[in-house]
Structure formats: C-alpha cells, structure tokens
Regions:
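A short hydrophobic beta-strand element
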Residues: 82-91, 105
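A short, structured loop/turn motif at beta-sheet edges
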Residues: 77-84, 111-117
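Short beta-strand edge/turn micro-motifs at domain boundaries
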Residues: 104-129
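A solvent-exposed, acidic/Ser-Thr-rich amphipathic alpha-helical stretch
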Residues: 4-7, 25-83, 102
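Beta-strand elements of well-folded, non-transmembrane domains
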Residues: 93-97, 111-113
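Generic short beta-strand segments
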Residues: 35, 88-94, 126
Length: 129
C-alpha cells in the first residue's frame, strides 16, 4: 500500500466534505476531474462533467433546508501500475437545519493523481437507508 497516496486521498476527501458542509463551490471544483462522473444512489441519475456537478451542487446549496452529505472512507486501494486509486466507504446525508439523518449508504470513488494532486474521476452511490 502507498501510505502517502492513501493519506493524500483521505485529506482530499476531508476537504471535499468540508466544502460540501460550507457550500463552497470554489473548493469543490479542484477536487473533481474535468470529466468526472457521479451516479446517484437512489435513481442512478448520471451527472457527467465537473461543470454539471458544480451546477447540481449550486442548486442543492440554494435549498433553505438542504441535505449535507459526508463521505467516510473505509478503505483505499492504490494501484501500483497506474496513478489511480479506488476508495470505498459509507456516506450519509443530514438535514442542514436539524441534523436529522435523511439518507445513508455506501459508495465507491475512483481517484487519479494529476499535476494538481488527486482528483475524483468517478463516484457511485448506493442508498441503503
């Protein structure tokens, strides 16, 4: 295992979680690859591209009682062959006004190391509750 890559990805994930909590679009953008793909957990909607994902977050952040999402990595597997890694973990969405749990589940994310650091290329979510 590449401990430095594991730590770098965990730090990027923490920064992404912080950006979601603070509704900080400027901090979300650099964590996403230009052609990032997100598959949602309930209806499997596909959000393709950084611009589309930032637009989706912008709309989400406008809601008066929005959902704050947190992803918690359980395991990160770093490839020895390519500058890529796979993150597995649990996610949860809580109400921004009451902190009640709205939904939760599992996710996987594919990361790529670039000149700007580790970026998310793809995420897929499974809603369990």
């Amino acid at each position: 295992m590449d401990a430095s890559a594991d730590l770098a990805i965990r730090l990027r994930r923490a920064a992404f979680n912080r950006a979601l909590a603070e509704a900080d679009l400027a901090a979300i953008g650099p964590v996403l690859a230009p052609n990032v793909v997100l598959v949602t957990g309930t209806d499997s909607a596909v959000i393709a591209g950084r611009k589309a994902q930032l637009q989706a977050w912008k709309q989400e952040f406008r809601a008066p009682s929005r959902i704050v999402y947190v992803r918690v990595p359980n395991a990160i597997t770093v490839s020895a062959a390519e500058p890529i890694a796979l993150e597995h973990g649990n996610w949860r969405g809580t109400s921004s006004t009451s902190e009640d749990l709205i939904a939760s589940g599992e996710y996987s994310a594919k990361w790529r190391r670039t000149g700007e650091g580790w970026v998310i290329e793809a995420e897929i979510f499974l809603t369990l509750a």
